[in-house]
Amino acid sequence: MRTFLSHTLLLFAVLSLAGCKKDDSPAQQTIADIVNSDSRFTLLRAAVAKANLGSALSTGSLTVFAPTDDAFRAAGLDAAAVNAAPVATVTSILQNHVLGAKTLSGDLPTADNTEVTTLGGGKIYVTKKAGAVSVNGARVTQADVTASNGVIHVVDRVILPPAGNAVQVASANPNLSLLVAAVNRAASGNPAVLTALTGPGPLTVFAPTNAAFNAAGFADVAAINAAAPATLANILLYHVVPARVFSTNLVNGDVTTAQTGKVTVAVSGSGVTVKGAKNTTAANVTAADIVATNAVIHVVNQVLLP
């Protein structure tokens, strides 16, 4: 009898210890707890503290697309930049990563660009195909990190909220000033160009850099303004696709543009290229998935020639 009691007490002790260990599992931690303890999220942690959102990430039922430190740095957001940014800006960025309900990767529809409303009221676009998930072109590198108040999906990019329509976003980038000048010059003869680029969309814009315009014979704004508006309109519409296509949605093949001609897209492990009908070589996409309210912008290093 004494042996039986000893074994029974030992069993209860083991079960009690097992129960204590279970309470410390990730599923018993809040989203805020996981962010605070995971070494990949030191910059996310700093942003959460800056925006004072720790309590918000400890309650409710949420989904958080969590950028790693590498993702923050790739967006130019190191610790100094996060701490120097206005609270409203950091809050807006963070809210663009949060959904107001727990959504596991298995619950996401297998589709391109499913529109989802974030906690901040903005829109993000989730793509799921062959089991891989991306959000606005940011890839989910680890899905379904469960917490007591929701789930975390780790992403490889910061999902920035749009800063305006396609023209407004381009206008804020000094490296795209000749593109903006070309849009304005084309609009003087064909208002439909500006209307399309500032309208509701959705669009994809392959945006040539200033260096790309220089190489195509447009040395400066004066050269742009000396060109025929109809010529510029024809070229610009050849850079616009009447659909929202993130880099993760691009596939090898021809794509029909708003000019009605086709460009040829090639996707490889080294990146994405786009070739116009009269280009001798393909343009490289040098910056992808810049989100505007009406478009996604991919910066290219050549002007595409129809």
Residue ranges and their predicted role:
Residues 2-8, 20-306:
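Mature, structured domains of secreted/extracytosolic soluble proteins
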